[in-house]
């Protein structure tokens, strides 16, 4: 009887041979993996109760009964576990044996179907066939969650690691390739479930919560000329009760359940790390009760020593009902992380790099200027090309917005040059936040924020460092926008009350720059703009497509982090609105800025030229010559950019040798069309989009995509805690205007300038929330994958791309050595500055934690 069953299952072919394989998988919850392993292996020989089946699909032998698609092998089932690959705490992976029947006619397998008859999902990492006769090893990279088969409308299929352009796909695999893409696209209807793998687009209509009152209504971003925006992933949640155009939100406590395609969800380690961050966001709801934690004035730091106690001595937590309730609701290990306790109930943060060597160097003019080149937002500064600076705002709506800075304000600081001479010698630069803020400033200043729109002029000195010349602070005219602005110009001083006023002027600039950094440089220009590329790549490029294989690592965790951001960070009354000066207008402002977003300008050389800090120069190593030679972000960035471009050029050139091959690639053309017309659909008619008609356009576009996702994001993200973890250095909010002579505030500024400074910038409780946020965002998880690394060494079978990738990795190692060398060069004063913080944000690799270095492959935090 058993023999008959076995014969039936294996087909009973006398000429069949056995092909052994290894399956690597992990259960959904590492902690109960042992249970799954026992259930899979303990009954493996119970023929009628086997739970996971595999069927190979031939790439050479057709099945006439199946529309001439590749023939399926007989089902094979998991055998005894072979070994556990990693420790339990790191996400245990277990290898199982599997044995297939095979014959000569079947040839080389190109894909396989898996069916999960178990009651729960598991993570399938890979299948390796050890020795297919006449073909050797065949490897399938899977990295996918497989749910019980009842959850799927079609079979789960995985392809071997041999890439194919659509026209080169073996005929017997083409239908499988096409059907898999159809599955991933879905039909645009219905609410998405946890097991779904569907990628689709939607507008940002889920940031507000109109069901909770008018104060929680937020502008829909995307789908309009007034507020254009990149698209996000569709969840299919129902509309709100009060506004059918707004998508309903899920409860805060279920934030981590927000839908993204299943394989886009964080891995075990990443989710564990992010859960801690989610818990921190809950603290915002109990902040009003936390003032009992502090001595002195409630919600105020009384001195810089008060601030420093956050990092050095710590703050004693009260053993009251609030603390007990919090610790009862949260596991001990998470409360330790959440509240930075050491077992003694002490709230303490790591010392930020900017105050590690010196507690006061951050206040120097040199450091203030240096951070525009090597800080957390080194992508804004531009060369001054007209004096006085002129506004591009419509004078009909906003009146005269041109700068009131005159030559008299600055010429005594130009080392003997006139303004014209300094400009002609490329010596004058500007940090300009004026035009962005003015249209919103009147509304922003009706909130707790009281701030200005700023312009900062800087002079490039002979030693390569910048010195600030003047700061202009502007407010909308009290009589109306059409009357322009009222402005005041401040110049450097180190004497008396004028010195304190200058420190405050720099603080207002830092507030402007901090908000622009979080809103534009970070969220919009990396997180938001890359998500449509993630969606389009999965919808239009098969996993068999070489460009899918090229780009896939650079999309890891992006949809999940963005979905969580919509849920707890950038939503109405979320952490972002609670900690930045733009408050509830923040995201709407980013939509206005997106109007000027140009994809080709995101390429680093193009960006540097556009900002006037570099000029095109074919004789220079990277095709551009920097006008600020000691510009750490640009110097290191150009090295990274060139390495990425060389790698992408080698890779794409292997698959595309002519324009014709680009044009006839139907998947590639559909991908680019969808990106333009849907993913970034509000900008579909822009003339600057590459046509995707030549290999060079493909190379340039892929290089830019990888740059945005990896190095650009690293440069603007992982410096947050090193520089903004000490809030006085980069305050996120200013709460009162510059003190005027004759007022009590002015007298306080004269008598106690430090206290006046601290009463102007971010309040104590906001500081705690803000520091907690940037600490989490600046940390690398222990499972991070960095530029030049891959999750699997067998990500492709093609040898030449593997060799090119190896060269890319070696080039990045060389760049690391060059960065270390430059940081040790005392002549390059901007590399470390007065705070002695070497520039390492574009150092390719890192270990886990708060390191201030490392370029992850993707926008993953």
UniProtKB/Swiss-Prot annotation:
The entry's free-text remark on the cofactor is: Binds 1 Fe cation per subunit. Iron is tightly bound.
**PROSITE patterns named among the record's database cross-references:** LIPOXYGENASE_1, LIPOXYGENASE_2, LIPOXYGENASE_3, PLAT
List localization entries: Cytoplasm
Pathway membership of this protein? Lipid metabolism; oxylipin biosynthesis
PLAT domain ranges (all copies)? 33-160
Obligatory cofactor(s): Fe cation
Q: What keywords are assigned to this protein? A: Cytoplasm, Dioxygenase, Fatty acid biosynthesis, Fatty acid metabolism, Iron, Lipid biosynthesis, Lipid metabolism, Metal-binding, Oxidoreductase, Oxylipin biosynthesis
Instruction: Please tell me in which tissues this protein is expressed.
Output: Expressed in tubers and roots. Not detected in leaves, flowers, stems, shoot tips, or axillary buds.
One biological process term from GO is: oxylipin biosynthetic process
Domain Lipoxygenase intervals: 163-861
EC number(s) on record?
A: 1.13.11.58
Q: Name one Pfam family in it.
A: PLAT
Family classification: Belongs to the lipoxygenase family.
Q: What protein name does the entry list?
A: Probable linoleate 9S-lipoxygenase 3
